[in-house]
Regions:
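Conserved SAM-binding strand-loop segment of SAM-dependent methyltransferases
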Residues: 1-9
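A short acidic, Gly/Pro-enriched loop at the edge of an enzyme's catalytic core
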Residues: 11-21
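A short SAM/SAH-binding and catalytic strip from SAM-dependent methyltransferases
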Residues: 19-34
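A short glycine-rich, Lys/Arg-flanked "PGG" loop and its adjoining helix->strand segment in the class I
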Residues: 35-50
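Conserved class I S-adenosyl-L-methionine
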Residues: 50-80
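Acceptor-substrate binding/catalytic loop of class I
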Residues: 63, 85-102
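A C-terminal cap/extension of S-adenosyl-L-methionine-dependent methyltransferases
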Residues: 105, 115-176
């Protein structure tokens, strides 16, 4: 069964448990109440259930490079505690940037980390791919370098996106 509802309303799901919960690219960045959302996730999972959360962390090398064009608003927007205005397909909303450490801290009592991967540390983000249109070899090399480095600290926790995969602890693991 697939259900779609706002993150803040996860408490409405009381009758089911799931094997896997997935948050699409940056979806969790749209709530200012992420700690409340994260607290609800373990209760929605079966034992050994997994989550895959894709967030936009506060550190994005490509956005920080805007400092060289003196565009400080873009270069540091992810560091704002009150979030930053964002727009997708002419819809404006507030986006909040959370660190992988924050998410893990809120979930670790109930969950184990399985994998982390940073995306777009070396490879430019999608909105900059037009610079690589006529450079397929460079694009391929950047993609491979990004995939490799994204699996190693500190690149696991930074980038345009960060993927965090966790598994719900078993009853035995809680007793340890």
């Amino acid at each position: 069964e697939v259900r779609q509802l706002p993150f803040e309303n996860l408490y409405q799901i009381k009758d089911k448990k799931y094997d896997f919960i997935f948050s699409n690219f940056g979806g969790l960045n749209c709530t200012s109440q992420l700690n409340n959302v994260l607290k609800q996730l373990p209760a929605l999972l079966n034992e050994n259930g997994k989550i895959m959360l894709v967030i936009m962390p506060p550190v994005s090398i490509w956005e920080h490079l805007h400092i060289f064009s003196l565009n400080f608003k873009v270069a540091f927007r992810r560091w704002r505690k009150d979030g930053a205005e964002a727009s997708v397909e002419n819809v404006t909303f507030r986006s909040y940037y959370y660190s992988a450490k924050y998410i893990i801290k809120n979930l670790q009592p109930e969950m184990n980390i399985l994998h982390m991967q940073g995306l777009c540390n070396i490879m430019p983000p999608e909105f900059m791919h037009h610079y690589l249109t006529n450079k397929p070899k460079l694009r391929k090399w950047l993609g491979k370098a990004d995939s490799f480095l994204g699996g190693y600290f500190p690149f696991t926790q930074i980038g345009d996106y960060c993927i965090i995969v966790m598994r719900k602890k078993t009853c035995n693991e809680h007793q340890l």
